[in-house]
């Protein structure tokens, strides 16, 4: 670990472009932006902002960026604001545009790394909102390993209609209800208009809120910051404090890899399990661990699942939203319960310089009695975690199932096979999928999609049609954090590389059994061998541009779908 007592130069990196006779031209560029000679002894701190009017998840980030810039100046640093791209999962969902979502994780990580290292910045504040902003930013922080902190843009507040709280998943499920004749046109339109009342990331324990909670547990974001609403004043105050904390970290030489250790990742994943977080966290923490050079495998999630119960009652399968969790005590309250039970590593250091145990010292040992969001460990929603790693002849490298909230976590039924999400969605909307079917959506993996689209539209349509627990769905693609039901994703190896999912035929018997951690194609080995011999790899869907590059470089989902695994 970096020595927190060392008298380090706080411009240790930036002096490469500001110090000495040979750097006069470099300094001249800074003078053009209003720098003074005395500024060159201050740390240059990047502010990587994903502000955008593309999506409500990011449309409220500019005030946070402005606040961070001002606070950095007050703390004696030179803020250097730059932008990172974002892709809206909610807007791209169900279209070809969704293929760019996971790709954007890599683009975000690459863009931040490029600016931080290209400009010799001494530290960086990453400000993000939508789903892939989260892992992309954290991957960049641990790659560059300069002092850094993550500032989450904050959650959206709930919408309201007829006495019911709404969020974006309400609209996706309303599509299924409407097509099934269970929702009239007026109510359908009102839900569409009222679900998202302002700025902030999708409000349940979906992917963005899952990752923000995990970053708080990881020690890379400030306490309580992950559940604050974007539009509330406390979010601005937290952003300013984040800037001040980062400057102190620069002075101490405290770096991301001092914080993001194997034990810290175990803490983060424990919180993901306890809060009922998104399946995407499996993919993203494989990628973050890879970037941090921390040994971590898909089986490590399973080890933690077996010892950590679900104690937070959050949507999509539960009842509450992130704003409710914040009012109930936020992630520190959840972490305190886990720490008291011996389920967290209290010695892990955080960006504040304090340990997890020190940060949680004054948090109550028990949740308040006047709230229903956070349970005790003696009265959990589920005795074990909800993200199960399944294996079988259909997915020998492993796949991910979200098993919370299911009355019967096992199904055996006939396969209904589709070679794209679009074909599957057409069949669902035409009511051709019936109770007992197992929908198989393939050629949607990291290479085959490419980009591993999220299957939120088909899963939500099934839920809306009343088939969420009576129809299984298996895919080499991903799921949104808002997905629930009998669903299995990240099937590896994927169809595009000849994985067993490519061999499934319509009508084959398929079993999903979460209790046995099994995903099985009930076809004999000899028949599967014949099918494998007859299988031919498909042509790439893209041969130019960023999707083609991603398809060429990406690893298996079981390794995090990273693009620099074998370089």
UniProtKB/Swiss-Prot annotation:
Binds 1 [2Fe-2S] cluster per subunit. This cluster acts as a Lewis acid cofactor. Its cofactor is [2Fe-2S] cluster; Mg(2+). This is Dihydroxy-acid dehydratase 3. Homodimer. Pathway: Amino-acid biosynthesis; L-isoleucine biosynthesis; L-isoleucine from 2-oxobutanoate: step 3/4; Amino-acid biosynthesis; L-valine biosynthesis; L-valine from pyruvate: step 3/4. It comes from Aromatoleum aromaticum (strain DSM 19018 / LMG 30748 / EbN1) (Azoarcus sp. (strain EbN1)). NCBIfam families: ilvD (TIGR00110), PRK00911.1 (NF002068). Mg(2+) binds at residues 89, 131-132, 454. Keywords: 2Fe-2S, Amino-acid biosynthesis, Branched-chain amino acid biosynthesis, Iron, Iron-sulfur, Lyase, Magnesium, Metal-binding. InterPro entries: DHAD_IlvD/Edd, Dihydro-acid_dehy_C, DihydroxyA_deHydtase, DiOHA_6PGluconate_deHydtase_CS, ILV_EDD_C, ILV_EDD_N, IlvD/EDD_N. Belongs to the IlvD/Edd family. [2Fe-2S] cluster binds at residues 57, 130, 202. Functions in the biosynthesis of branched-chain amino acids. Catalyzes the dehydration of (2R,3R)-2,3-dihydroxy-3-methylpentanoate (2,3-dihydroxy-3-methylvalerate) into 2-oxo-3-methylpentanoate (2-oxo-3-methylvalerate) and of (2R)-2,3-dihydroxy-3-methylbutanoate (2,3-dihydroxyisovalerate) into 2-oxo-3-methylbutanoate (2-oxoisovalerate), the penultimate precursor to L-isoleucine and L-valine, respectively. The gene is ilvD3. It catalyses: (2R)-2,3-dihydroxy-3-methylbutanoate = 3-methyl-2-oxobutanoate + H2O; (2R,3R)-2,3-dihydroxy-3-methylpentanoate = (S)-3-methyl-2-oxopentanoate + H2O. It is an enzyme of class 4 (lyase).
